[in-house]
Design a protein with these regions (language model features):
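Intrinsically disordered, low-complexity, mixed-charge
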Residues: 17-167, 178-192, 196-327
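Sec-dependent N-terminal signal peptides
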Residues: 4-12
């Protein structure tokens, strides 16, 4: 009974997990969605600002509350991510699990991903999109707006050190965001990059504190004549890079069988389409260069940089390793 209760708790907390196939349809034509995403971003922000202004003069928490109604995860009924996933106006690739690199996944490799209902309830395989040349999952916006918000609150409001914030993110990814056999069985460093960049986005809205990469992009919103106003438009091209792409920032499988299945799928893709690459990373030089901007020292007993907590250090798809960030 105790084990069933534990299973149920982990399962319930894992329901926001979905996985992305960054390979199967990668080389099919797909229109860049960055322009429409940016346009809708600023429209949603203006609508949230209008609602917040109706609650009083420049009330900060009211503003965040209204923005969070739109910029949130699907399970919290975030309206923008629901639009991204479902709207025909936003170009995307839809891939069923049976056609994906996870088609050999067994229940014991990742329950949420391998169960029959995975293709029907949106918790299994997510959609993929071309954002300014980066082939990313729609789930990365959920990570930016969901986990990114929690990173932001922990660092800028609760006084967590950045190392502690990143540790919490590592634990969440392992325990209930995919990286265990009860969830999807896939540990995704690219999600951690999205979380971190989401923290930057939330901070830049009002410029609550210094940017951790030293790039002050905000404030996007300011109090003008006792009312909130969008004074600068958001451009998510400032945040999204190759670190979001799971064909560059390689994922880890939590079981040997899950890893064998993914490698088998990639081998089949290579045989079917030998003129294109189906490996990770697709471009070693690019992911190495992108990683450099995150190499900001975070101190502490173990030292290291933020990049150590955000990027797969082995530069390949492999079985999950405990304490991988300390390698």
């Amino acid at each position: 009974m105790k084990n069933l209760i534990i299973f149920g708790l982990i399962l319930c907390s894992s329901l926001e997990a979905s996985e992305i196939d960054s390979f199967t349809r990668r080389y099919e034509p797909l229109e860049d969605s960055s322009q429409i995403i940016n346009k809708r971003t600023n429209e949603y922000l203006n609508e949230a600002i209008e609602r917040a202004n109706g609650k009083g003069e420049c009330q900060k928490e009211a503003l965040y509350q209204e923005i969070r109604k739109d910029f949130n995860i699907i399970l919290n009924k975030g309206t923008f991510i629901q639009e991204i996933v479902s709207s025909d106006d936003i170009p995307k690739h839809v891939i069923s699990r049976s056609d994906s690199i996870f088609k050999y996944h067994q229940i014991t490799d990742g329950y949420l991903l391998a169960r029959p209902a995975a293709d029907m309830d949106g918790i299994g395989i997510g959609t993929t999109m071309n954002f300014n040349g980066h082939y990313i999952g729609s789930d990365k916006f959920e990570h930016m707006w969901g986990q990114g918000y929690h990173y932001f609150r922990r660092f800028y409001y609760k006084g967590f050190t950045i190392k502690r914030v990143l540790y919490v993110g590592l634990a969440n990814e392992r325990l209930h965001l995919g990286g265990n056999p009860i969830a999807t069985g896939v540990y995704t460093p690219a999600d951690l990059v999205a979380n971190f960049q989401g923290m930057r986005f939330w901070n830049h809205l009002l410029n609550e504190g210094p940017d951790l990469l030293g790039e002050e992009l905000g404030p996007y919103i300011s109090c003008v004549d006792n009312s909130w106003k969008l004074i600068k438009e958001v451009d998510f091209r400032d945040y999204i890079d190759a670190g979001f792409d799971e064909a560059y920032n390689c994922s880890m499988l939590v079981t040997k069988n899950g890893l064998r299945g993914v490698k088998r799928s990639l081998s089949e893709l290579n045989q079917k389409d030998p003129h294109n690459l189906y490996t990770c990373p697709l471009d070693l030089d690019e992911i190495t260069q992108v990683r450099k901007k995150y190499e900001v020292s975070i101190g502490g007993l173990t030292g290291g940089t933020m990049a150590d907590y955000l990027f797969n250090p082995w530069l390949e798809i492999l079985e999950y390793k405990l304490f991988w960030w300390l390698r």
